[in-house]
């Protein structure tokens, strides 16, 4: 619930900046064991990248999927034409991948045909 609040607050901020956010979600009823400060760092980086690189004329997609053993959060956006020329070291995304990996999860980010996808999978606490 707390993780969802972090994401939704940032999405609200993006909507206030004029972004069209498209959400899709399974019914989420799970618990995660996560360092909330590190998770804030991960999502802070993702939203910073969205604000810098996303095409404001096309929707940003966010989906939440609950599986038997993990929670999957995906962010998708088209890259703005002027953003394609901006330099990036990719260190932020590498740090995100390490943090999520240290939590026992997986992190993917990549671009294909101008569309950028970030996929985070975090293990659930099974009671």
What positions do the PLM features span?
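Glycine-rich/acidic phosphate-handling loop/turn and adjacent ATP-lid/helix
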Residues: 72-90
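Short beta-strand/loop element within the Bergerat-fold HATPase_c
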Residues: 57-69
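A residue-level detector for a conserved hydrophobic packing site
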Residues: 39-43
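Short helix-loop "hinge" at the ATP-lid/N-box region of the Bergerat-fold HATPase_c
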Residues: 50-51
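Conserved micro-motifs of the catalytic ATP-binding
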Residues: 31-34
């Amino acid at each position: 619930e707390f993780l969802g609040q972090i994401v939704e607050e940032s999405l609200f901020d993006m909507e206030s900046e004029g972004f069209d956010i498209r959400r899709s979600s399974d019914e989420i009823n799970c618990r995660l064991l996560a360092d909330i400060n590190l998770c804030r760092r991960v999502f802070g980086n993702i939203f910073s990248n969205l604000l810098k690189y996303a095409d404001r004329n096309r929707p940003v997609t966010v989906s939440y999927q609950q599986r038997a053993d993990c929670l999957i959060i995906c962010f998708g956006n088209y890259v703005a034409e002027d953003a394609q020329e901006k330099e990036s070291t990719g260190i932020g995304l590498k740090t995100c991948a390490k943090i999520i990996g240290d939590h026992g999860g997986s992190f993917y980010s990549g671009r294909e045909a101008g569309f950028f996808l970030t996929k985070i999978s975090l293990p659930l606490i099974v009671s």
